Amino acid sequence: MNVFLWVVAVFLAFVFLSTGLLKLVRTKEQLAATGLGWVEDFGPGTIRLIGILEVLGALGLILPAVTGIAEVLVPVAAIGLALNMLGAMSVHIRRKEPTLVVMTGVLAFLCAFLAWGRLVLVPFS
């Protein structure tokens, strides 16, 4: 189970690091042009904040475990990212984007599973 939790953590870290960095380096218009229509509902500052939170969450999924420092931050980061994805789900529900509702729901589930796994199943010592 420990290996599986690591695989989930690395996958989620990759997803959130890449999407978070995109939100930080591209303008709102560039993001909208790539098909991220939800950005029209938010200001540039909010989009940047989401990007910052995703990058920090991605780092929080890996760095504490790798360094052995404050390992409790791994499930905390996972819970934060799960909450972020629940917010994203509500946006996609409102915008009637069922594919994105499912995708963000799967990410929220994986984040919650990782948090549960690291808090209950295989906690760090």
Language-model regions, residue ranges each:
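Membrane-interface extramembranous regions
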Residues: 1-125
